[in-house]
Amino acid sequence: MTRNEEIMTILQEECAEVIQAVSKVKRFGMSENHSALVKELCDLQAMIELMYEFQVVNCTIDQKFENIFQKRQKLKKFSRIFESNS
């Protein structure tokens, strides 16, 4: 397995662990699962950063911000996340 493959494999595993942590929050509540969710999100963020650090993927800061902006625009249109009463 190459380094890039290993990074992507661990990234995939971390995504699954975030899914599991979110599921536990939904089932049992945030107060009992907050620290586990934070840990898994940080682990995922670490792997995302390694994807860029080792140039498994690359893009400019401007491209990152534009993609994030576009996602937020979609969420504003198709979800209720940004509504004041959510």
Model-based region annotation:
Residues 1-41, 45-86:
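Flexible "arm" and connector segments at domain edges
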